[in-house]
């Protein structure tokens, strides 16, 4: 089974506001960078989009190590998701799960892979995380340019 390391990050200027996501996939000496942005979004949605797009890029089942600076993503997928599903996509206090559309998508995408989820401190000099952060900020700029072009 192919091994892939993923570094993901999201960025948001205003929350909600302009947002971007970035992800770096590394496997066997090959690297792939992906990024994108949205005009009106939240930081958590962009963090989720970064990992979703990483998994969408995988063409076959892989052993994946995901590094994220988002405790929301890391804890959500590792600790909270099973409970949300068991409760019909409700939190422990019976409120609807925020961003359930993205959580459902991520849940579907990871099922064919062996995945380990790792939290890293953001903006602490971790090279993979710093690259993902730079890509997420590129995504913000693309969203900004798209708005300006449409104005």
From Swiss-Prot:
Broad EC category: hydrolase
GO biological process terms on file: DNA replication, removal of RNA primer
Main location: cytoplasm
The enzyme's E.C. designation: 3.1.26.4
Subcellular location as annotated: Cytoplasm
Co-factor binding comment: Binds 1 Mg(2+) ion per subunit. May bind a second metal ion at a regulatory site, or after substrate binding.
Keywords, alphabetical: Cytoplasm, Endonuclease, Hydrolase, Magnesium, Metal-binding, Nuclease
GO molecular function: magnesium ion binding; nucleic acid binding; RNA-DNA hybrid ribonuclease activity
Catalytic reaction list: Endonucleolytic cleavage to 5'-phosphomonoester
Segment forming the signal sequence: none
Keyword Endoplasmic reticulum annotated: no
Pfam family, one: RNase_H
Gene Ontology cellular-component annotations: cytoplasm
Residue sites binding Mg(2+) 1 per the record: 9, 47, 69
Boundaries of every RNase H type-1 domain copy: 1-141
Annotated positions binding Mg(2+) 2: 9, 133
InterPro entries (UniProt xref): RNase_H, RNaseH-like_sf, RNaseH_domain, RNaseH_sf, RNaseHI
Cofactor(s) listed in the protein's UniProt record: Mg(2+)
PANTHER family: RIBONUCLEASE H1
Physiological role: Endonuclease that specifically degrades the RNA of RNA-DNA hybrids.
Family: Belongs to the RNase H family.
Name recorded for this polypeptide: Ribonuclease H
Species assigned in the record: Ralstonia nicotianae (strain ATCC BAA-1114 / GMI1000)
Organism placement in taxonomy: Bacteria, Pseudomonadati, Pseudomonadota, Betaproteobacteria, Burkholderiales
Gene: rnhA
């Amino acid at each position: 089974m192919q091994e892939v390391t993923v570094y993901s990050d999201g960025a948001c200027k205003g929350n909600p506001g302009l947002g971007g996501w970035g992800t770096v996939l590394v496997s066997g000496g090959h690297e792939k960078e992906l990024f994108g942005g949205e005009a009106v979004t939240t930081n958590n949605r962009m963090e989720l989009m970064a990992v979703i797009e990483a998994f969408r890029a995988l063409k076959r089942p892989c052993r994946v190590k995901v590094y994220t600076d988002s405790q929301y993503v890391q804890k959500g997928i590792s600790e909270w998701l099973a409970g949300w599903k068991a409760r019909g996509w409700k939190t422990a206090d019976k409120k609807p799960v925020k961003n359930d559309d993205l959580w459902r998508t991520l849940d579907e995408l990871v099922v064919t892979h062996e995945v380990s989820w790792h939290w890293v401190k953001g903006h602490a000099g971790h090279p993979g995380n710093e690259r993902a952060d730079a890509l997420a900020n590129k995504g913000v700029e693309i969203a900004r340019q798209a708005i300006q072009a449409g104005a």
